[in-house]
Amino acid sequence: MTSLKLLKEKAPLVICITNDVVKNFTANGLVALGASPAMSEFPADLEDLLKYAGGLLINIGTLTDENWKLYQAALKIAEKYNVPAVLDPVACGAGEYRKKVADDLINNYKLAAIRGNAGEIASLVGIDVASKGVDSAGVDNIDEIALAANEKFNIPIVVTGEVDAIAVNGEVVTIHNGSAMMPKVIGTGCLLGAVVASFIGLEKGQELKSLETAMLVYNIAGEMAEKRPNGHLPGTFKVEFINALYEITDEDVKEFKRVK
């Protein structure tokens, strides 16, 4: 089974093409976890780096026409070297341009997983869910949204919210761990996309277990951070979350996981 120990042993190089707001937080989070991040954004450099990579994250948060071309180039190179790519279609339900870019990347390039909140994933499959920018309202049918997207795209899907859902090959599991402090720190969702990219390629054919482990590690680390002194304050939580990602073990995951 995919484990945190395996990630630390392999220390996969993860290329993160992510939004400008969260680059530092993302890099520090991956280092704490045990992965090796690179924030490269130039196609010639990506050609050199991706041949050694264990994962690629495409996060469309700070979207421009130039970045769209960069995403396309990176995904072409990743497919060339069989590097699993994860798409985070940030705010794709908030406007036509973002939806157009997300649709292009999903329909024309090879993806190993898509990670988004309920509003984002629902917009990709035409389900009506209230969404405001990068945030979405709580929904009761998050597992149905995950399954609908998995069926439509035949790609593993992670839908995040108060409850998280993972759908792979028509099978769905829900994760009931996490911290209410996470939405109060900008970048926690974006870092999660990078964590998913770190785990997804560890074991071929074990995508469901890999995604489940990624989500549990991340969410339980959030619970650990919130319980620490002043962890209920967003500034302290941000620091303690990085610390928790560094300290969490497979034993913690086994003890505290809540999966249905």
Swiss-Prot record:
GO molecular-function term, one example from the UniProt record: ATP binding
Keyword Kinase in annotation: yes
UniProt enzyme class: transferase
Pathway: Cofactor biosynthesis; thiamine diphosphate biosynthesis; 4-methyl-5-(2-phosphoethyl)-thiazole from 5-(2-hydroxyethyl)-4-methylthiazole: step 1/1
InterPro entries: Hyethyz_kinase (IPR000417), Ribokinase-like (IPR029056)
Catalytic activity: 5-(2-hydroxyethyl)-4-methylthiazole + ATP = 4-methyl-5-(2-phosphooxyethyl)-thiazole + ADP + H(+)
Keyword Nucleus: no
Residues binding substrate, per UniProt: 39, 187
A Pfam family the protein falls into: HK
Keywords recorded for this protein, A-Z: ATP-binding, Kinase, Magnesium, Metal-binding, Nucleotide-binding, Thiamine biosynthesis, Transferase
CC cofactor: Mg(2+)
Domain of life of the organism encoding this protein: Bacteria
E.C. no: 2.7.1.50
GO biological process, one term: thiamine biosynthetic process
Binding site for ATP: 115, 160
CDD domains listed in its UniProt record: THZ_kinase
Family that this chain belongs to: Belongs to the Thz kinase family.
Purpose of the protein: Catalyzes the phosphorylation of the hydroxyl group of 4-methyl-5-beta-hydroxyethylthiazole (THZ).
Protein name per the record: Hydroxyethylthiazole kinase 1
Organism: Streptococcus pneumoniae serotype 2 (strain D39 / NCTC 7466)
Gene it is expressed from: thiM1
